[in-house]
């Protein structure tokens, strides 16, 4: 806990899990936790408030842990039922943080107080009192520059988020953190008054109608030994071996205070059976709690299939952090393994609590047929290692169980076999097939390395997952193949779309965080080509809203790039038919503007071809196209979908579906139907705030004092990207 004399200011993070399942997960999810925060007014701004952690002062001469627990109880009494307060399980010092301002040179400690799992208890809202917030919602908007949090609180929350992520990777740490405190685990404490040294020791203990002195006298009078045996070794210098010959477990331990009138001492031959009953109870409880695991152990294919039809999760971990497939592979149940993989769509690389995979279990047990099934799975990671850095082949050769030689041969042969491949598309429709050396464990960074781009070019692009109406950018450590598999769940979480109509594909696209100043310095022809293809795609789809003159210039450049120099005999007015216009003019302008633009486009095309000062090298023309696009507000934006409400009349509202574009310049709203630019705001000109439950966000324009709310399930992603891109800007760039 540290030296209490050096600690004065203490901040307290009271956290609770939303359900017990999250305690056994090796993967950290912020949405599985809630945290207790205060809301306090911002100085000088009465209506605005910021969130802070609970804060207290520590008394150097008091017991720190108990003092903090008492403080939490007192602080939360107004919001809890029956004024009981929230009782923490223990107090953990996470780390100390240096203070700023007047307190420079001093430190504040952050203590973590784990609480009980969230239940149906209703906590009352009381102004000035703390309330629980979803940790994921908090972390989405948390940064040291955010006005929603005190700076020190933001710093502590970011550190707490990282700390929880690290602790989830440690076996048994999280279950131990939220385990009941030692005092809670003591059911009954009875002091034998015959051995009480002081009368005070038996206060509040079991009372039989006698004082401690009277009971002690009675027991001493009754304690008469018929036989006395001395231990000859006790107190002597003789050597002896300290060993346990027998362990006897009291089968009634932990069952509560018994009714002594009903207890019958069993006969000696029944003692062994009573001891085993405790183990039997635990096994029976495991069978009841984890039926899928039990049937995977036993290899009951029919019942296993039936349970999967009922919707039981193949990824659920039991108390030992094992999934059903781990048991099936450990016990050599071939058909059960096949059903879990094929019908249950189980991840073949699913790790248990000790970071061992199904392939490790099958190889360690020498189950060659299961090894074969796993190795032929398209998503398998042949090079996977466990917590000790061992491959499945290492485990197989160490254990030498059953048919281990055949299993080892299969593993050796698999190393040299061709890998499964995945198509990574570009925005022009072309693609490159990339080997998946680690199956569905392959990261976005590893796929980028397989694209055979130079290190310099890789900086400008990243891997995206896109379907018809949703596009998401991966971080380097994300595993794209797993996201493709989970796409229906992702769609359900972020949209109201029908998953059957949304087929995900992986794309190589511009990194949304790429600064324009960096892009303007790119000279590599391949990088320019990839950027050009993406810009052209977005232009034709109507995402680049610009004046007519700009769109006509871009159309003439596309004609020069696609058809070469202008020829009067070949490129007459009839040359620009409807099909040709589709390839050079935004879809939103085809009917309304394109027919009237034909002469202007041909005129600019002719002037461009005849201009001697313009290089006709392909990458130079493509760069000119990009230079014109850089001036468009929505260039390089990531687009999300949402809705805004406007007053159609005093009595009702009109719903307008919109695209929400976020780029290095700011935020932009486009009418989803017409692609008209409704609003475009630079970072210096607006503020934003995530709404409750993460289903909307509010925008306030500082120029015209206008505020509006965008309703979207993607609000958390939008706000997080706004914070990231705004944080990248230099102060001078924010106003440009």
Curated annotation (Swiss-Prot):
Keywords: Angiogenesis, ANK repeat, Cell junction, Cell membrane, Cytoplasm, Cytoskeleton, Membrane, Repeat. Residues 430-452 are annotated as: Interaction with RAP1B. One of its GO terms (biological process) is regulation of angiogenesis. Residues 172-195 are annotated as: Interaction with ITGB1BP1. Residues 420-736 form the FERM domain. Pfam families: Ank_KRIT1 (PF24521), FERM_M (PF00373), KRIT1_FRMD8_FERM_C (PF24522), NUDIX_5 (PF16705). The keyword Ribonucleoprotein does not apply. The keyword Glycoprotein does not apply. It is a peripheral membrane protein. One of its GO terms (molecular function) is microtubule binding. Residues 1-170 are annotated as: N-terminal domain similar to Nudix hydrolase domain. GO terms for cellular component: cell-cell junction; cytoplasm; cytoskeleton; plasma membrane; protein-containing complex. It comes from the Eukaryota. Gene3D superfamilies: 1.20.80.10, Ankyrin repeat-containing domain (1.25.40.20), KRIT, N-terminal Nudix domain, NPxY motif-rich region (3.30.70.2240), Phosphatidylinositol 3-kinase Catalytic Subunit, Chain A, domain 1 (3.10.20.90), Pleckstrin-homology domain (PH domain)/Phosphotyrosine-binding domain (PTB) (2.30.29.30). ANK repeats lie at residues 287-316, 320-350, 354-384, 388-419. Expressed in heart, brain, spleen, lung, thymus, kidney and testis. Isoform 2 was more frequently expressed in the thymus than isoform 1. The FERM domain mediates binding to RAP1A and RAP1B and is necessary for binding to phosphatidylinositol 4,5-bisphosphate (PIP2). Component of the CCM signaling pathway which is a crucial regulator of heart and vessel formation and integrity. Negative regulator of angiogenesis. Inhibits endothelial proliferation, apoptosis, migration, lumen formation and sprouting angiogenesis in primary endothelial cells. Promotes AKT phosphorylation in a NOTCH-dependent and independent manner, and inhibits ERK1/2 phosphorylation indirectly through activation of the DELTA-NOTCH cascade. PANTHER family: KREV INTERACTION TRAPPED 1-RELATED, KREV INTERACTION TRAPPED PROTEIN 1. Found in a complex, at least composed of ITGB1BP1, KRIT1 and RAP1A. Interacts (via C-terminus FERM domain) with RAP1A (active GTP-bound form preferentially); the interaction does not induce the opening conformation of KRIT1. Interacts (via N-terminus NPXY motif) with ITGB1BP1; the interaction induces the opening conformation of KRIT1 and competes with ITGB1 for ITGB1BP1 interaction. Associates (via N-terminus and C-terminus regions) with microtubules; the interaction is inhibited in presence of ITGB1BP1 and active GTP-bound RAP1A. Interacts (via FERM domain) with RAP1B. Interacts with CDH5. This is Krev interaction trapped protein 1. It comes from Mus musculus (Mouse).
């Amino acid at each position: 806990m540290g030296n209490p004399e050096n600690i004065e200011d203490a901040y307290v993070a009271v956290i609770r899990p939303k359900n017990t399942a999250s305690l056994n997960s090796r993967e950290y999810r912020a949405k599985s936790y809630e945290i207790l925060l205060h809301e306090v007014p911002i100085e000088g701004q009465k209506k605005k408030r910021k969130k802070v952690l609970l804060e207290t002062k520590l008394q150097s001469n008091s017991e720190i842990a108990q003092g903090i627990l008492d403080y939490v109880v007192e602080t939360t009494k107004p919001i809890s039922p029956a004024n009981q307060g929230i009782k923490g399980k223990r107090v953990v010092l996470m780390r100390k943080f240096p203070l700023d301002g007047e307190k420079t040179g001093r430190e504040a400690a952050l203590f973590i107080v784990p609480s009980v799992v969230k239940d149906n208890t209703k906590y009352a809202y009381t102004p000035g009192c703390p309330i629980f917030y979803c940790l994921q919602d908090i972390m989405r908007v948390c940064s040291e520059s955010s006005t929603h949090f005190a700076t020190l609180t933001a710093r502590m929350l970011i550190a707490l988020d990282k700390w929880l992520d690290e602790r989830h990777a440690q076996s048994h740490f999280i279950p131990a953190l939220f385990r009941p405190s030692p005092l809670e685990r003591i059911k009954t404490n009875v002091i034998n008054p015959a051995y009480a040294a002081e009368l005070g020791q038996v206060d509040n203990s079991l009372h039989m109608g006698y004082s401690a002195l009277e009971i002690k006298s009675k027991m001493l009078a009754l304690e008469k030994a018929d036989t006395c045996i001395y231990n000859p070794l006790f107190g002597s210098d003789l050597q002896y071996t300290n060993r346990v010959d027998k362990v006897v477990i009291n089968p009634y331990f932990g069952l509560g205070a018994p009714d002594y009138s009903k207890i019958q001492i069993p006969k000696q031959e029944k003692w062994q059976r009573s001891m085993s009953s405790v183990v039997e109870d635990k096994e029976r409880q495991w069978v009841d709690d984890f039926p899928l695991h039990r049937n995977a152990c036993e290899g009951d294919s029919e019942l296993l299939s039936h349970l999967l039809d009922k919707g039981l999760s193949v990824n659920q971990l039991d108390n030992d952090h094992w999934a059903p497939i781990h048991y099936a592979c450990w016990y050599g149940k071939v058909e059960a393994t096949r059903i879990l993989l094929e019908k249950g769509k189980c991840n073949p690389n699913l790790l248990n609590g000790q970071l061992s995979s199904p392939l490790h279990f099958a190889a360690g047990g020498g189950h060659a047929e299961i090894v074969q099934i796993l190795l032929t799975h398209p998503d398998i990671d042949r090079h996977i290692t466990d917590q000790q850095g061992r491959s499945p082949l290492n485990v197989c050769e160490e254990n030498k169980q059953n048919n281990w030689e055949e299993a080892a041969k299969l593993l050796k042969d698999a190393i040299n076999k061709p890998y499964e491949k995945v198509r990574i598309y570009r925005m022009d429709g072309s693609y490159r097939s990339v080997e998946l050396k680690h199956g569905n464990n392959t990261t976005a960074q590893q796929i980028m390395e397989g694209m055979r781009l130079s290190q310099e070019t890789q900086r400008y692009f990243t891997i995206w997952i896109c379907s018809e109406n949703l596009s998401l950018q991966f971080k380097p450590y994300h595993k794209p193949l797993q996201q493709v598999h989970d796409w229906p769940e992702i769609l359900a979480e972020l949209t109201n779309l029908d998953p059957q109509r949304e087929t995900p594909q992986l794309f190589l696209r511009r990194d949304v965080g790429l600064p324009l100043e960096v892009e303007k310095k790119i000279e590599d022809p391949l990088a320019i080509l990839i950027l050009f293809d993406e810009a052209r795609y977005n232009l034709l789809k109507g995402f680049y809203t610009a004046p007519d003159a700009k769109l006509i210039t871009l159309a003439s450049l596309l004609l020069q790039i696609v058809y070469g120099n202008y020829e009067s005999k070949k490129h007459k007015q009839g040359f620009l038919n409807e099909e040709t216009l589709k390839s050079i003019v935004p879809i939103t302008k085809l009917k309304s503007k394109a027919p009237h633009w034909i002469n202007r486009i041909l005129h600019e095309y002719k002037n461009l071809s005849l201009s001697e000062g313009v290089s006709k090298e392909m990458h130079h023309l493509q760069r000119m196209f990009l230079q014109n696009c850089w001036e468009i507000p929505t260039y390089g934006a990531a687009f999300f979908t949402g809705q805004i409400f406007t007053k159609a009349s005093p009595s009702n509202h009109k719903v307008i579906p919109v695209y929400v574009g976020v780029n290095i310049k700011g935020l932009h709203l486009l009418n989803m139907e017409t692609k008209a630019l409704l609003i475009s705001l630079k970072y210096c000109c607006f503020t934003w705030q995530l709404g409750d439950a993460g289903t909307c966000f509010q925008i306030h324009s500082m120029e015209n004092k206008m505020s509006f709310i965008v309703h979207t399930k993607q609000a958390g992603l939008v706000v997080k990207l706004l914070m990231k891109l705004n944080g990248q800007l230099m102060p001078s760039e924010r106003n440009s």
